[in-house]
Every structure is written in C-alpha cells, then in structure tokens.
Regions:
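Short, strongly patterned local motifs
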Residues: 1-102
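A conserved ligand/cofactor-binding region detector
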Residues: 97-99, 103-657
Length: 657
C-alpha cells in the first residue's frame, strides 16, 4: 500500500506541476478576482513556476506537514492511530489550484498538524488510558466523543459555557469519578468492537444497505458529537453558520481571559502571518491587549463588589457569579477576534458534510485547517456519511463553486464606492404593510376549508378590530415567553440592517432559524465604549487598546488582506449585518434577548427592533402580543437570574460552593 501511495503521490505532483504551468504560466501567482480572497502573495509561494512539496500559493501549506507531525508524535493517539507514514495530500485551497484532491480513509487516520501555538494538554498515562476509550484522540484540538450515553455527552458540552477547561480535562475532573454516571464501569466493559476502530464492520453494512435503498436523506439519520478547541472567534462563527446543528460555545460572560494557556494568552496566531515581519508585531500587540484586559478585570471586580454589596439573602456563590458576569460583560469589548474559544457541536452527517464544504472553500487557513481535522475525526465516527467531501468531482467541485461565487461577488462589490453615512444602530429596511392582515388570514387556514387566497380576500373585508381579534386569538393567553404562537405568525417578515459591536453580533448570530448575513469585521465603523468603562476609570486604557489594534489591523490588511486583518479587531468595533425574520421568530428573539439578564448591547438591539415593528411597520397588534419584551434598564442585570438558578438548585438539594 505504501509503495502504491508513493507512486500515486509522485504522479499527482507531476500532474499538478503541469496544471500549474498551464494555468498560471512561469512565475505567475494566481489570485482570485475577489478582493483579498487569498491575500497578498506569500514570499514562500512565489518561486518561478515551482511546486515544492505542494507549497500552495496564497497559503503555503506543505504536503509533508501531517507526515512530519505523525512521525514526531507516533503515540499522539494510541487507541486508533497508526504511525504508518502514508502520504497525506492536504486540501488545496480552491483559490490556489481550483481542485481538491481526495483523502482516503487510511489517510484520514493520520493526525493533523495542530495550529501554530496550539497548547497540548498534559495527561498522565492513566488519564490517557481513560480518555482513549471515550475520545477519538487525546492530543489534538479537534476530537469526537464516543462510547458515552447521550446525556453525558450533552452535559460535557454544557460545561463549556462556564469553564476555561478543555472538555477532556472536565471529563476527567468532574465525570469519571462520579459514581452515578458509571463511566468507569463503561470503560472496563469496552472492547475493540466498541471502539471507533470497530466501525469498519458497521461501515461495510451501511454501504451495502445504502447502495440498495439509500439516498442523501439517510445522512440525516446518524450524528456525532465533536469538539473544536482553541478556535478563534472568527472560526467559531464559521463553525456555527449552519442551521441544522446544535452548538455550545465557551462564554465570555463567565470566563476571565486573564491567564495564559501554556506560553501565551488565549489568542490565535493566523498562519497567514507566520514567518512574516508582522508576526512579532501581532504577538506583541495581542500580549499588550490581554495584559490591559487582565489589569482592568482586576480593577473592575473590586469596584463592582463595593458598588453592589452582597445582600444577606444571597449566597456568596450567587453574588460572586453576578459580579463576575458584570465585569466580563463590560470588558469583553477589549478582547480581539483572535481570542480563542471552545465549541461543542452535535450534528447529522449531512449537516457536517455541508459545514466542511463551506469551510474548505474559506480563504482563511485556520478555517480550512480545522475542516481538515474535523474530517479526520468524523471519519472515525461516521465515515460513510462523509465519503464525498474531498472527492474532486463531488465535494471538491462544490467547494470550488462556493469559493468562485464568493470571489465574484467580492470583485463586484469592490466597484461600489460610496461614503458611509451616519444612521441608527438598527434600521427596519423592509416589511409587508399588509402583514397583519395576512397573519389574520393564516390564523384561520388550519381551521377552515377555504383556499389560502380566498381566506385572505375574506379577511380584507373585515373591520380592523376584527382582524386584530384574529391575531390576538392566534397568540392566545401566554403564561410566559416560551408559550409561542403557531405558524400563522410566519406569514409576515421583517428585515433589519444592524450596525452593532462585534460582541453583540456574536450573541445574535446564534439565532439560526432566521436569515442573517454579515460583512467583514473591520475598524472602519468605529467602536463602542460602555458607560461602565468610565466608571471604573478605564477610558484611557480602552481607547489605547482600540487605537493600537486598529493600527495593527490596517497593517495586516495592507500586506495580507482584509480577511486576515479581522483577527486583530476587538469585539468593541462595530460590524454591519442584516437580520431577516418572520414574526414568529421575532417573538423568540426579541423576548429572549431583551430579558433583564441579557447583555446591554443586544438588549438595546432587541428593544429597538420591537419599537420599529410597532411604530414604523405599524404592526401594533403583533408587537403587543410580544408581551414579554422587556424595555426596562437594570444595573446588575444578572442578579435575578442567578437567584432563580440558586433557588432551583436548592429545590433539588444541590448546595452552592
């Protein structure tokens, strides 16, 4: 097999050299038509007409990266991996060659090289023995969770939100020793048939059944849990793009980013900058930002403790959690988009396939690298669902299509040059003036025998009060915000253009049933400064961070393109995006995101949207039915929520530590 693979690799190299010369000519570096689709030419990729070990133009990835990593780390994943050296053809970025070579199942078993600066956790031999039974690898940033009850997998991901620890460390510290979970008992009963390697037989059975009876929808019926750790806040948005998947991300509300993870603070170093003159400046700036953030956290916590003293009725745990959330909320704007996070994903094979196709078409190396690592791990758990992702004429063609469309639109948008004018943070740009009439007609549809158009004609003849009565009947008597009206509310929609800080956008982007699209993060729209920054005496430090990161982002954009420059931009800078949602989804988003415990940034956006639906669209009956939208302001917003959670824990016999 190795000899055949080596011959295949040699033939591919020769074919690629011929294709390279025919497409690009001697010494020409192909660049996408779209602005910054790849970025500036890499010095390491501009040798005249050469393809050295498949160093890709615009990205510089080597075919030997994975093999070298596997050779240096033969025990990196003892339970499923083999140290056998199989030539690994890394995915060509579609902007480089326009074709993505396939990856065999054997190649998928070779560990992917981790991102630059990835912090590898240290585990004892005993810990590794336990982890190897339940995780598809022990060392990498991307891994699957296997052989555990579904509720335990969900609980593991749930802990991500409030913990700085990795899921593997959480599993060892909080789950393994828990007698009620029986993890140790599960581990002792597992054999090779239960391990990921044992999937080979099931895969063969599945393929026989699929060939006879299956279609694409079969891939909706099997799923997997996968973790992506130490991922930047640019990557997390790419991971969480798809609607039909479930995500849980580490929260900036509950975690201080004032401690280093290994040798540096929790930020990603993009490969686009590796080995360039800007890498040192990037590291120095990021270190300075996190040091300032750490100093301001140290100032904010005691300030809020004195401003909001503990009440006798509150436990120390509730009070500390509330103070911590307040400090995190106010200072998160300092964190750059390069800040790393942990993300847990549960999705079907079909959802993963589409996610990987999008990621492989992305111009950022980090996103493509994680796609490569995810494909490796998913092929251990659900290999049959992901056979097409890297086939040149299937997934390769699909990813190339996505990339070419993006590049074409980038080029066309670059021709539009207009000055940016001041406008409100939230603008209602489109709605149906007859929306309430249509909702009233839709409310009758399921209970009637008439066609849709005849019901609409009938409702148009009714007095306004009768139409409002139909909408109120469709909404019903709601006891809380979880009592949502039915699908009649989907008959009308609202389209908002929003210009908010990146932190608020991150929270709203998680609403995936609506339609949301965003522009690149940059410094051109300015930044927001919460009122609390002046209260804790941090205005000068805040402004200095914003100015210094803007300088760095502008330099990265100049030499490496605006896509890579996003990493340097803090959460406080504003990003433009639109949200298009029907009234039923508006019930969910506006009532949830305006709750007292929410962040002030997105609470204001939700409140503005509600006012615009009521006043500008004139849909007063629908707006009135959204009775749990909260327009009040709060000083210590999280306190009541923490009290409610404490009461729930007490009712179940759980004491706060």
């Amino acid at each position: 097999y190795e000899a055949a693979a080596d011959r295949n690799a040699a033939e591919r190299t020769k074919e690629d050299e011929q294709q390279d010369q025919s497409q690009f000519g001697s010494g020409e570096v192909r660049r996408s038509a779209g602005r910054d689709a790849v970025g500036a030419e890499s010095p390491s990729c501009s040798a005249a007409g050469e393809v050295r070990d498949h160093k890709h133009r615009g990205c510089g990835h080597s075919n030997n990266d994975r093999d070298e990593y596997a050779e240096k780390n033969p025990q990196s994943d003892q339970h499923t991996r083999k140290a056998t050296r199989v030539p690994r053809l890394l995915p060509f970025h579609v902007h480089c060659y326009g074709q993505i070579p396939p990856m065999s199942f054997e190649q998928a078993a070779i560990p992917s090289p981790p991102p630059p600066g990835y912090h590898v956790e240290s585990f004892t031999d005993d810990e590794r023995a336990v982890l190897s039974r339940f995780f598809t690898n022990v060392d990498g940033p991307v891994f699957g969770i296997v052989n555990l009850p579904e509720v335990v997998k969900g609980a593991l991901f749930a802990r991500y939100s409030r913990s700085p620890l990795s899921v593997r460390r959480l599993f060892l510290d909080e789950f393994v020793a828990e007698p009620d979970l029986g993890v140790n008992a599960i581990a002792t009963t597992l054999d090779d048939e239960d391990s990921p390697v044992g999937l080979a037989r099931a895969q063969g059975l599945y393929e026989r059944v699929f060939t006879q009876y299956g279609d694409d929808s079969v891939a909706q019926l099997g799923g997997a849990h996968i973790a992506c750790e130490q991922a930047s806040n640019i990557l997390t948005k790419a991971l969480e793009w798809g609607r039909l998947a479930s995500y849980l991300e580490q929260s900036t509300r509950y975690i201080f980013y004032d401690r280093r993870l290994g040798a540096r603070y929790r930020y990603h170093i993009p490969r686009e900058l590796s080995g360039t003159p800007l890498e040192d400046e990037y590291r120095e700036t990021m270190d300075a930002v996190f040091e300032t953030y750490s100093a301001m956290i140290g100032r904010a916590v005691p300030f809020y403790e004195s401003l909001f003293p503990k009440q006798e009725s509150d436990s120390a745990f509730v009070w500390r959690s509330t103070i911590r959330a307040k400090a995190c909320d106010d200072l998160r704007g300092m964190l750059p988009a390069a800040t790393t996070s942990n993300v847990g994903i549960f999705a079907s094979g079909q959802a993963y396939e589409m996610l990987l196709l999008r990621m492989r078409a992305n111009p950022l190396r980090e996103i493509r690298d994680y796609a490569d690592m995810m494909l490796t791990e998913l092929r251990i758990m659900i290999p049959s669902f992901l056979t097409r992702v890297d086939l040149p004429d299937r997934g390769g063609a699909w990813s190339e299509y996505l990339a070419s469309v993006s590049a074409d639109l980038d080029a066309r948008a670059a021709d539009i040059v207009r000055p940016l004018e001041d406008r409100p943070e939230v603008t209602l740009v489109d709605w149906d003036p007859e929306g309430e009439t249509k909702v009233a007609a839709a409310a009758l549809y399921a209970a009637s025998d008439l066609p849709d158009d005849e019901l609409l004609a009938y409702v148009r003849t009714l007095p306004a009060e009768d139409r409002s009565a139909l909408i109120r009947a469709a909404a019903g008597t709601r006891g809380n915000r979880r009592h949502k009206p039915g699908r009649a509310m989907e008959r009308t929609s609202y389209r908002f253009d929003v210009l908010s800080d990146y932190g608020a956008f991150r929270d709203l982007q998680r609403h995936r049933m609506l339609t949301i699209e965003w522009q690149r993060l940059s410094t051109q729209h300015g930044y927001v400064t919460p009122d609390a920054i002046a209260d804790i005496g941090a205005t000068a430090a805040w402004d200095e961070v914003m100015e210094r990161t803007a300088t760095l982002a502008n330099r990265i954009e100049r030499f490496h393109g605006s896509v890579a420059a996003q990493y340097a931009v803090p959460f406080a800078y504003r990003i433009r995006y639109y949200i298009d949602m029907n009234a039923r989804e508006a019930f969910h988003l506006l009532e949830l995101r305006s709750q007292p415990s929410g962040h002030p940034g997105y609470r204001k956006i939700a409140q503005d949207m509600h006012r615009l639906i009521r006043d500008e669209a004139g849909h007063r009956t629908i707006a009135h039915a959204m009775q749990f939208v909260d327009h009040n302001t709060y000083d210590l917003a999280r306190l009541e929520e923490e009290r409610r959670l404490a009461a729930r824990r007490a009712a179940r016999g759980i004491t706060d530590e």
